[in-house]
Amino acid sequence: GCPWMPWC
């Protein structure tokens, strides 16, 4: 996941 988007 991305640091700012947990669903990435």
Curated annotation (Swiss-Prot):
Q: Which PROSITE patterns match?
A: CONTRYPHAN (PS60027)
Record-listed 4-hydroxyproline modification sites: 3
Q: What is its main location?
A: secreted
Q: Which residues carry this modification: Cysteine amide?
A: 8
Q: InterPro entries this protein is in? A: Contryphan_CS (IPR011062)
Organ and tissue specificity: Expressed by the venom duct.
The answer to whether UniProt assigns keyword Disulfide bond to this entry is yes
Q: Which domain of life is it from?
A: Eukaryota
Print the keywords alphabetically.
Amidation, Disulfide bond, Hydroxylation, Ion channel impairing toxin, Neurotoxin, Secreted, Toxin
Q: Which GO terms describe its cellular component?
A: extracellular region
Mind listing the GO molecular function terms for this protein? ion channel regulator activity; toxin activity
Which positions form S-S bridges?
2-8
Task: From the Swiss-Prot or TrEMBL record, state where the protein is found.
Answer: Secreted
According to the UniProt entry, the note on domains is:
The cysteine framework is C-C.
- Mention any additional remark: Exists in two forms, due to cis-trans isomerization at 2-Cys-hydroxyPro-3. The cis conformation is the major form.
Task: Give the family per the record.
Answer: Belongs to the O2 superfamily. Contryphan family.
Per the entry, what this protein does is: Its target is unknown, but this toxin may modulate voltage-activated calcium channels (Cav) or calcium-dependent potassium channels (KCa).
Protein name as catalogued = Contryphan-Fib
